[in-house]
Every structure is written in structure tokens, then in C-alpha cells.
Swiss-Prot record:
Region named G3: 91-94
Organism encoding this protein: Oryzias latipes
One Gene Ontology term, aspect cellular component: cytoplasm
The keyword Nucleotide-binding belongs to this UniProt entry's keyword annotation: yes
Domain tr-type G intervals: 5-242
UniProt name for this protein: Elongation factor 1-alpha
Keywords: Cytoplasm, Elongation factor, GTP-binding, Hydrolase, Methylation, Nucleotide-binding, Phosphoprotein, Protein biosynthesis
Residues modified to N,N,N-trimethylglycine: G2
The encoding gene: eef1a
């Protein structure tokens, strides 16, 4: 069998009509998990509806619709393989909660693929001041997605088709604006593609003989190639944070007859093993882990990325809930936050945000109202430089450092220590009004309970 391929996550971003669905659909279609029968079924439906020309996007639309109806269709459909990696597409904008998902996202993307349309007038629309392209790219960078690939799509609809001049014009302009955001254009592969016809997707196109391939320079090693698939292969593999202390935000807590209380969640950092003594914050409740399971099989240890259930002793299902975080009681255990400072970017708020504003924050699995207790400073959203102290208010487009106070017990961490617990979405009026990255946290000591099982386990050690 040989060694299993490394799993990586990508997020696909870009303007509505850039052809994200078609390009993504093409990759999944050609290298991916969609079985032939499903494809044939979709193709037949597409043809019957006169959508023959739309087949890749149609495949993706079907998947998306099923995903949104809450039917968890075989998630393998969102995966495809390159020669080096198993790639999972964790989300594609256009989903209603894209921004929220990207932030509280169950997984951090290792790389963003930005699709821009090269068609006449299309590129300009996507990148204009109010186009989504900038917003998505800024969001990806702010949330720590440091690798980027740019697919210049719809090369078949430039004037003349497959125009070298148009590709170079777009490459130049996109380079300028991703540089402003913080990406280094020299480390970004720019690939001229047609997601529809398949040019430079998996195989080099014979229509763009002028394209001598993409090159990237970075301190972790240079790379070059021709196709989008090769660019995905050149992504630097993520280092999964097993060496950090354990952080496991709870998604659910079950009571299982004959077993007892079983919290479920995804290991974000560190490892979880049977026999470990864990502390749940905010209530500061300490107990022993009896067993750890994934897909109904017991595990000797769970590592970052694993979605697990674990059985704990002497704790009732009423004492812990979704949004709580488990950690190793002997190694920097999580604590309740009294307040925290964060850098926020206001995305779409119809009015002004003043001191005292108390929207709901979505951070990891927690969903808790937090008060903007102090607007500390307004900053330039690209450079981070201070613009003014103690602004009276902030509005859409602004970035600021603010002090937030959770209105109920909550666990958050500085982004620099534990990224998945250090980014959040601010939700109000049924939309994401702001995103934030946590800079510093003031914790509070809560005297919690330690179960008998934990005391016994600690004595044994």
C-alpha cells in the first residue's frame, strides 16, 4: 500500500460568476470521488433540462443543494486526489454561511484558490471596490490562510480567445492587490485556465503555447509547473499541531445507556488518550477519560483533525455542553475568559457600531453574546497601523482593536497560540457583520469540581 497521502484542505474563493463551481466541479469530476453512476445520472438530468453546457457546475449545484438541505451526502464527493495529496474542498463561497464557516470552520484551509474570470469586463466587475474577490482574499489572509493559488479562468472567452496580453494584465493587477492584503505574489502560482474546456486544469493546454508555466519562489523551496493540479501539488503540507497542549471544543454531549456521558468534538490541537485527566472550561470541571472512539472504533490516541467521542467518568450530561472546551489538566488547561482584545474587521453593518454593542460571537463551537466594552483604536485594515485612539464608533470597512466581554462563561484563546479558538464571526441581523482575530485574553479563575475518577488517576501517576 505504501504511505497514505497527506490530507490537505482548500477553500475556493472569487466573485460569483468567476466560474468557481465549474472549475471545482471539473477537478472533483476528473480526479475525484464522484462515482460514474452519479455523474451519468446528473448528466442525463442536465441534458433533459437543457443545461448540457453547464455540466460541471451542475454537478456541483446538485451537491450544494443537497448539502444545504442538510442531507449529508457522501462527503467524498468534495474530495479529489493529486499525485501527492488527498484534497478536501472545505467550502466554496456562495453557500449562505460561507464567511461564518470559513471562520468557525471545522477545518482551517491550508491554501486558498482564488478564481478570477478573464472575460471582457468580468474581471473588472469582480475586483471592483465592492466585488467579493477582495473581501474573500482579505478574509482568507486575516484568518491565517497564508498560501494562495490564482486561477485565471474563462481564458476561452477573452478577446481574442486565450489572449496572452489579457492574462498578463490580470496577473499584474491581481499581484498588486494581493500584495496590499499581505500575500507575496512571487510565492503565488498564476495559472491561465478554462474550467469549462479543461485547459491547464489537469493537462497542459495546446491553446496557450505562449504560457511557459508558473513559477513560485519561497523560502521553503521553489516550485514550477503548468497546470492547476500541479499548483495544488506544490502546496506546502501543513504541520498538524500535535505538539501543542490539547484543545477540543465540544460539538455535542450524548448520554449513552450502559456507557455514560460521551462528549463529541474535533481535536484542534494536541492529543487525547484514554487514561488522561482532562479539564472542561469554562466550568473548570476535571475528570478522567475512559475511552476514545472514532467511527465506532476505539482509538489509542486522537490527533488534530480527528472527530471523536470520548467517555468520561462521574460527570452528568447536564454539567457540560456544546461550546465548552476540553484540555489536558496538567498542560496549560483552558480557562474561562473574563475579557479579550481582538482585531475586528467590520464587513457589513448598516449603521455604526458603538461601545456597548452586544452581538453574538461564533468562535469554534461556542455561540455567545459578547459586549464591545471598549473601542481601543481604529487601524488600517491592511497594514495594521493605528489611525486613531478610542474612536467614537466604527462602521463597515473599518478595522479596529476592541475589548470584548463575554456575557456568559466562554473559552477563547489568542490566535497566535491556538488559531481555531482565536478567530470568530460576529453575527447580527442574520448575517456576519464582522470577523475578528483574538490578540490577548484575560482569564478568570473558577473553582470547579474534580471528580473521584480524576483524583484516583492523578494519584496513580
Amino acid at each position: 500500500m505504501g504511505k497514505e497521502k497527506i490530507h490537505i484542505n482548500i477553500v475556493v474563493i472569487g466573485h460569483v460568476d468567476s466560474g468557481k463551481s465549474t472549475s471545482t466541479g471539473h477537478l472533483i469530476y476528473k480526479c475525484g470521488g464522484i462515482d460514474k453512476r452519479t455523474i451519468e445520472k446528473f448528466e442525463k438530468e442536465a441534458a433533459e433540462m437543457g443545461k448540457g453546457s453547464f455540466k460541471y457546475a451542475w454537478v456541483l449545484d446538485k451537491l450544494k443543494a443537497e448539502r444545504e438541505r442538510g442531507i449529508t451526502i457522501d462527503i467524498a464527493l468534495w474530495k479529489f486526489e493529486t499525485s501527492k495529496y488527498y484534497v478536501t474542498i472545505i467550502d466554496a463561497p456562495g453557500h449562505r454561511d460561507f464567511i461564518k464557516n470559513m471562520i468557525t470552520g471545522t477545518s482551517q484551509a491550508d491554501c486558498a484558490v482564488l478564481i478570477v474570470a478573464a472575460g471582457v469586463g468580468e474581471f473588472e466587475a469582480g475586483i471592483s471596490k465592492n466585488g467579493q474577490t477582495r473581501e474573500h482574499a482579505l478574509l482568507a489572509f486575516t484568518l491565517g490562510v497564508k498560501q494562495l493559488i490564482v486561477g485565471v479562468n474563462k481564458m476561452d472567452s477573452t478577446e481574442p480567445p486565450y489572449s496572452q496580453a489579457r492574462f498578463e494584465e490580470i496577473q499584474k493587477e491581481v499581484s498588486t492587490y494581493i500584495k496590499k492584503i499581505g500575500y507575496n505574489p512571487a510565492a503565488v502560482a498564476f495559472v491561465p485556465i478554462s474550467g469549462w474546456h479543461g485547459d491547464n486544469m489537469l493537462e497542459a493546454s495546446d491553446k496557450m503555447s505562449w504560457f511557459k508555466g508558473w513559477k513560485i519562489e519561497r523560502k521553503d523551496g521553489n516550485a514550477s509547473g503548468t497546470t492547476l493540479l500541479e499548483a495544488l501539488d506544490a502546496i506546502l503540507p501543513p504541520s498538524r499541531p500535535t505538539d501543542k497542549p490539547l484543545r477540543l471544543p465540544l460539538q455535542d454531549v450524548y448520554k449513552i445507556g450502559g456507557i455514560g456521558t460521551v462528549p463529541v468534538g474535533r481535536v484542534e490541537t494536541g492529543v487525547l488518550k484514554p487514561g488522561m485527566v482532562v479539564t472542561f472550561a469554562p466550568p473548570n470541571l476535571t475528570t478522567e477519560v475512559k475511552s476514545v472512539e472514532m467511527h465506532h472504533e476505539s482509538l489509542p490516541e486522537a490527533v488534530p483533525g480527528d472527530n471523536v467521542g470520548f467517555n468520561i467518568k462521574n460527570v452528568s450530561v447536564k454539567e457540560i455542553r456544546r461550546g465548552y472546551v476540553a484540555g489536558d489538566s496538567k498542560n496549560d488547561p483552558p480557562k474561562a475568559a473574563a475579557s479579550f482584545n481582538a482585531q475586528v474587521i467590520i464587513l457589513n453593518h448598516p449603521g455604526q457600531i458603538n461601545q456597548g454593542y452586544a452581538p453574538v460571537l461564533d468562535c469554534h463551537t461556542a455561540h455567545i453574546a459578547c459586549k464591545f466594552n471598549e473601542l481601543i483604536e481604529k487601524i488600517d485594515r491592511r497594514s495594521g497601523k493605528k489611525l486613531e485612539d478610542n474612536p467614537k464608533f466604527v462602521k463597515s470597512g473599518d478595522a479596529a482593536i476592541v475589548k470584548l466581554i463575554p456575557q456568559k462563561p466562554m473559552v477563547v484563546e489568542p490566535f497566535s497560540n491556538y488559531p481555531p479558538l482565536g478567530r470568530f464571526a460576529v453575527r447580527d441581523m442574520r448575517q456576519t457583520v464582522a470577523v475578528g482575530v483574538i490578540k490577548a485574553v484575560d482569564t478568570k479563575e473558577i473553582s470547579g469540581k474534580t471528580t473521584k475518577a480524576a483524583e484516583k488517576a492523578q494519584k496513580k501517576k
